Amino acid sequence: MSVSQELFDRARRVMPGGVNSPVRAFNSVGGTPPFIAAAKGPYLTDVDGREYVDLVCSWGPALIGHAHPVVTEAVHEAVERGLGFGATTRGETELAELVVDRVAPLEEIRMVSTGTEATMTALRLARGYTGRDLVVKFAGCYHGHVDSLLSEAGSGLATLALPGSAGVTEATAAQTLVLPYNDVAALEAAFAEHPGRIAAVITEAAPCNMGVVTPQDGFNAAIRRITQADGALMILDEVLTGFRVHEAGYWGLSNAAGESWAPDLFTFGKVIGGGLPTAALGGRREVMEYLAPTGPVYQAGTLSGNPVAMAAGLATLKCADAVAYQTIDRRSEQLRAGLREALDAAGVDYSIQEVGSLFSLAFGTRSTGVHDYADAKGQEAFRYTPFFHAMLDAGVYLPPSVFEAWFLSAAHDDSAMDRILSALPAAARAAAEAQPPQP
C-alpha cells in the first residue's frame, strides 16, 4: 500500500471524503489522490517520493512557481515579526495600493480571507447600496460556496453532477435569477421582467469553472450597459483570472484589446495571496464607502489582512512583472500546440477553450465549441479519466476534473515542458480508446 493510500484511508475516518475541498478527492477521475509533501518551482513531490510537473499550480496562486525564494523570504520575515495581531498593519496598505494601482477602475478595496467571502460581501454591498433584493448569475459560473450563488454553479458541483446544494433554502434561491451564459437577450428579458428590483449581475470575468469559456464579443460590455441603464451594479468575479491572465487581470486583458467597459465591483483571490488565504473586493469609492465602518453594510474578519498573507501576496505581485506574464503566455501556447498535435494524431474529437494563458480541454466538441454550461455538460467527459491517469502515471499532475482550467507558471522551464509534451501522445491514445459508460 502506498503512503498516499494509507493517509487517504486515515483522512476518510476523520474528514468527510478525506478532504477539505471536494475536487481533491478524485471522485470524477477515480483512484487515490497523491498526498503532496513539498513543491518547488513547477514540481510537486508526493509522500511516496514521486515527482510531478504541476499543471494545477494550487488552482492559480503559484503564478511564479512554488516556493519562490523572494516570496518565502518575505513570509519568513513576516512570521518572525508575528503571525497576526488583530490590528492594522503596513502590509495591508501596501498590498491595497499595489492592487489599486494595477487595476485602473479600482478606487478602494477591502481584504478578506477567501474568494467566497469576497463574493458574499460584494452581494451584500450591492444590495445595501441599491436597496434591491434580486441578483443575476449565469449558469456554470462559480462564485464560491455562497448559498444564493450555488445554483448551476459549475466547478465542484459539475464535477459531482449536482444541480445545486442541499441546505440552500427556497427563499434564498428565489432571490437569484440564473441565466444562460453569453446570452444577452436573456439578460435583457430578466431586467424587463424585474425593473428596478435587480441589485447586481455577477459574472466570472471569463468563466473557468465549467472549463474555460470565452465571453462572446461584447458580452461583458452588454452586461455593463444593461446594468447601468437600470441602476444595478456589475460585479466582475476575478478570483481566478485576477493577476493570472494579465497584470491587471481579465479586465486588463480586455482593456488592452480595446474594450472600454468597467464594472462597479471586482472580487479577487488566489494570486493576490501568493498561496496563502487572501482575497479582496473592491470598486468605486462611492460604493465601497457603504462598507462599515464608513457605511451601513457590515463586514468583518478576524484574519482579514493577515500580515503573513499580505507579505506573500505583495511579494508575488511584485515578482509578477511583464517578463513573467510573457513566459507564462509562451509556455501555455507551447502546451496547447503540443496538445493539439497529440490529440489530432490520435484521432480524438476535441476543442481547446482558452482565455489568455488559461485553457481547458473538452472532448467531443470540435464542431460546437463550448459557449455555455449546456455545452460544457454535453462534452464526452468519460474520455478525460483515462487521459488524466495516463498523464499522472507519466508524472504530470492535471486538474482532477474536466471542468477545471489548466495552469502554468513562470517557473515552467524547458525541462518541465519536455516532460509534459512527451506524456501527451500516450494520454491522447488512452482518450481515443475510451468507451462511454454503460447505462
From Swiss-Prot:
Keyword set includes Transcription: no
The reaction(s) this protein catalyses: (S)-4-amino-5-oxopentanoate = 5-aminolevulinate
Primary location group: cytoplasm
Functional pathway: Porphyrin-containing compound metabolism; protoporphyrin-IX biosynthesis; 5-aminolevulinate from L-glutamyl-tRNA(Glu): step 2/2
Top enzyme class: isomerase
Record keyword Iron present: no
Protein name: Glutamate-1-semialdehyde 2,1-aminomutase
Biological classification of the source: Bacteria, Bacillati, Actinomycetota, Actinomycetes, Micrococcales
This protein's encoding gene: hemL
